[in-house]
Amino acid sequence: MPDLAQTQHFPFVCEGGLISNRSTFIMRAGEALQLENFEPDVEGGYRRIDGFKRHVRSIVPHTSSTEESVLLTTFFDNKIIAARGEKIWSSASTDLGRASINKITAGETMSGSGVVTVKNTTGFSSSGSFVIDSEEFSYTGKTTTTFTGVTRSTNSTSAAAHAATGTNRTVVSETWTVRDTGRTNAGKYSFERFNYDGNDKIVLVDGTNAPVVLNTSLATTDISESAIAGASIVASYREHMFYAGMSGTPQELVFSVPFDEDSFTSGQGAGSVKVDDTIVGLKVFRDALFIFCQNRIFKLTGSSSANFAVTPVTRDIGCINGKTIQEFAGDLIFLGPDGLRTVAGTQNIGDVNIGTISSNVQSIFDDNILDSSVFESVVIPEKTQYRLFFTKTSGLESRTEGIICVLKPQQSGQPAYEFSKIKGIKPACTDSFIEQGNILILHGGFDGYIYRQEE
């Protein structure tokens, strides 16, 4: 037996995250050499990430090819809004009631008089169809928590048993309803939720067609202004709607009159500004509209067209892709040419500091920035977590990589950014939304389905 008389316990805290830029000889105790599909936990240590599952059971219908990826997924007015091919669709999603009395047996007969109990029916049509697992049901009415007049095994599907438990939810989702058509050659969408007149709306842009506005009835209205046709970027600032990313005027930012996303009369407060670089993203932060370009960053300040002013933040650093820009932990975070960076406001009003934060995992960025065709990001506020996905269109989902960034308190008392690696999630588009205190982290897949992360 070895003599252990001189040995001592050496307690340490798992903190510091994944480190790929330092020798193991100088790494601190608790830092990780490998940290894949684990996340730094704001409550301490590292934990395995939660997975993802279909949030809408049926596939988003394609236009001309099953190879079409999902171009948009977002949450608006209790509906899931998605785009694929040339069309925009809506659905709704809830959970099967978790009590044992709410289970559905395979032999249970439902021929127009069945009742299915769910968590809630908010967002579902007053009558229509829904899907549980692979079985489709029709219904003729609903209450706040039940579908009534239910017929099962519709649309050539087979009856099956369905149940939910306290730890495992069973998704109940509405079949897709088309809301807009004819969006020829649409690219990936950007969107902005807003309320200028007491009515919630969402404006969608796709880089090719006219911007389109949806109201809470999901009726669509195209914005026909020629100056913003083909916009791919949109943001609301000071009650003006700003549009950018037009292929013919990539350096121009066009804004509407106040409180009207569809009016561009210059004498009533509309106008445009130009910068000397191609715009890739817009983000409102600390009373300014930040304009991210390929090689520069600007900010627009002011309260109206009379005093809007554009000033440079930096002329030396740009943003690789506008889909990486997020408000995170009191800063704006974005993907620069050398990794993740923040636009951090200091104590001096108007002073801005640009800093890189991802040097600990620089090799992962070096391996992925140049050959990734799609970049997507989400923020999980309750975890103070930012996720960035590097997607190669032809690559396998199982080989798709990403980065988790967490701002986490350290033993020193100061917060620090910690990182880990994601593998096996391949989003074509993303969105995060807080719904009645619940955080929805959605992504649309290259396979045509809508998924919810953190499942």
Model-derived regions: residue spans:
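Small/polar beta-strand repeat architecture
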Residues: 99-114, 119-188, 223
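Short strand-coil-strand connectors
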Residues: 77, 85, 131-133, 207, ...
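Secondary-structure transition/turn motif
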Residues: 84, 92-93, 118-122, 149-158, ...
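Beta-sheet-dominated scaffold domains
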Residues: 195, 239-240, 248, 275-455
